[in-house]
Each structure stands twice: as structure tokens, then as C-alpha cells.
């Protein structure tokens, strides 16, 4: 089966989070149309995501060998988790990230997660001559779902969407060339504004799915 890796980065319960509400609607609809996909989920506020430290590494983006390195049990478990997250990321076909817009970017746990999954000999290759992504070995695509309280004018999206732009740049460097966005703009201050923004985003879901290369498109 193909794998859809669903990554959320919001501490709110799903029903209170617009990004997670639309994320759930998206993956449910996608799997309805593409039942050959299985879903794996990572909640960056609930799951253990190590904060990278020098003790985890033996070289540039290269974690230590747990079998030979002189490290304590806690560090060994952290290194194993870093490798596990990176391997899980490598094994996926479709990635869906659901995140709110915070301070022109995204919540900090997403950056810590990205740092974990970008590892030498798993998702990138690091040599003295070059650093290159390794995820161009098969068809992979990403959908970035972002909620924001206000409407972001088209002309200023490059200024205010620094988080989205950063994620797109990193994924393309890794080898994930097709990047789709689903914006939940204008969630506002009232429950009515929130529901209206979510309804508008739900209407966009099928069009995003149609652009995904390996989708059955309904």
C-alpha cells in the first residue's frame, strides 16, 4: 500500500483547530477516493520529537551509531527516535501538514520535526562535494494546509507566508517536487467566521486532490 503521512502541529483539540479540521476532512476525502493509501499520523504536540543536540551526532546531519557510541540510555532512545521519524518520512508517498500561521511562520515543533527528518543517508546525502536530497527516487507530493485569522492579500503572500514558503523550499530540496497548498484564511474572531472559513476551504479539497499525481480524482 501507499502511505499518506499526516502531520499536525496545533495543541488545540481537532474540533477547535481550523487547520486540523480541514486536515481531517482532506485526508478522509483523499482516502475515500484512493483506498490503496494507508494513513500514518504524527501529532507534533503529543508525540515525542527530540530536540536535537550535539550529543546526537557524529558528523554533519549524521546521528551517532547507538551500538558503538558511548552514550547514555536516554540519548540512545532519542537517537533511535530521530532515525525512526526520518525513516517514516522517507517511506511515505503523500505528505499532509496541517499548521496554523504563527508569527508569519508556523509553531516551533514543526521546525524541530523537520530538523529530525532531514538526516544523512536517509533523506539527504552529505559529502564534502555536495549536499543533496534523496527523496526524488519515486513520486512524492506534499499538501500544506494552513489556517490564519485574517485574509492574506495575494500580493503580500510572499511576505506573510514565510512558513509555507520555507516548507516548500525544504521539501523541494529533499526531492519532493510537487507541493500543493490549501489555505484556510479568515478564521477571524467569532465562531461564525471560523465556520465560514472552514466551509470555503472544504470546497477547495476536491480541486487540490485532482492536482495530485497518483490520485484517482473521484
Swiss-Prot record:
Q: Does the keyword Flavoprotein apply?
A: yes
Q: EC number(s) per UniProt?
A: 1.6.5.-, 1.7.1.17
Q: What are the names of the required cofactors? A: FMN
Q: Which UniProt keywords apply?
A: Flavoprotein, FMN, NAD, Oxidoreductase
* Xref: InterPro entries: Flavodoxin_fold, Flavoprotein-like_sf, FMN-dep_NADH:Q_OxRdtase_AzoR1, NADH:quinone_OxRdtase_FMN_depd
Record field: catalytic activity: 2 a quinone + NADH + H(+) = 2 a 1,4-benzosemiquinone + NAD(+); N,N-dimethyl-1,4-phenylenediamine + anthranilate + 2 NAD(+) = 2-(4-dimethylaminophenyl)diazenylbenzoate + 2 NADH + 2 H(+)
Q: Which domain of life is it from?
A: Bacteria
The UniProt record gives the binding positions of FMN as: 17-19, 147-150
Cofactor-binding details, from the entry: Binds 1 FMN per subunit.
Query: Listed GO molecular functions?
Result: electron transfer activity; FMN binding; oxidoreductase activity, acting on NAD(P)H as acceptor; oxidoreductase activity, acting on NAD(P)H, quinone or similar compound as acceptor
Sorted alphabetically, which SUPFAM superfamilies does this protein's record hold?
A: Flavoproteins
Q: Describe its assembly.
A: Homodimer.
Query: Which family would the database say this protein is a member of?
Result: Belongs to the azoreductase type 1 family.
Q: Record's HAMAP family?
A: Azoreductase_type1
Q: What does this protein do?
A: Quinone reductase that provides resistance to thiol-specific stress caused by electrophilic quinones. Also exhibits azoreductase activity. Catalyzes the reductive cleavage of the azo bond in aromatic azo compounds to the corresponding amines.
This chain belongs to the protein called: FMN-dependent NADH:quinone oxidoreductase 1
The encoding gene: azoR1
Amino acid at each position: 500500500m501507499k502511505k499518506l503521512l499526516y502531520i499536525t502541529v496545533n495543541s488545540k483539540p481537532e474540533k477547535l483547530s481550523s487547520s486540523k479540521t480541514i486536515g481531517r476532512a482532506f485526508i478522509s476525502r483523499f482516502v475515500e477516493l484512493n483506498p490503496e493509501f494507508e494513513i500514518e499520523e504524527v501529532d507534533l504536540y503529543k508525540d515525542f520529537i527530540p530536540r536535537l543536540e550535539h550529543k546526537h551526532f557524529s558528523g554533519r546531519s549524521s546521528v551517532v551509531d547507538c551500538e558503538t557510541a558511548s552514550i547514555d540510555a536516554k540519548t540512545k532512545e532519542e537517537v533511535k527516535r530521530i532515525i525512526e521519524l526520518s525513516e517514516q518520512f522517507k517511506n511515505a508517498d503523500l505528505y499532509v501538514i496541517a499548521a496554523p500561521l504563527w508569527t508569519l511562520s508556523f509553531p516551533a515543533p514543526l521546525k524541530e520535526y523537520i530538523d529530525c527528518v532531514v538526516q544523512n543517508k536517509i533523506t539527504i546525502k552529505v559529502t564534502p562535494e555536495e549536499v543533496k536530497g534523496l527523496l526524488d527516487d519515486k513520486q512524492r507530493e506534499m499538501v500544506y494546509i494552513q489556517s490564519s485569522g485574517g485574509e492574506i492579500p495575494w500580493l503580500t503572500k510572499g511576505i506573510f507566508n514565510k512558513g509555507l514558503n520555507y516548507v516548500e523550499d525544504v521539501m523541494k530540496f529533499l526531492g519532493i517536487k510537487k507541493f500543493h497548498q490549501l489555505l484556510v484564511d479568515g478564521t477571524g474572531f467569532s465562531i461564525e467566521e471560523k465556520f465560514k472559513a472552514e466551509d470555503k476551504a472544504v470546497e477547495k479539497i476536491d480541486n487540490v486532490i485532482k492536482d495530485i499525481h497518483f490520485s484517482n480524482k473521484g
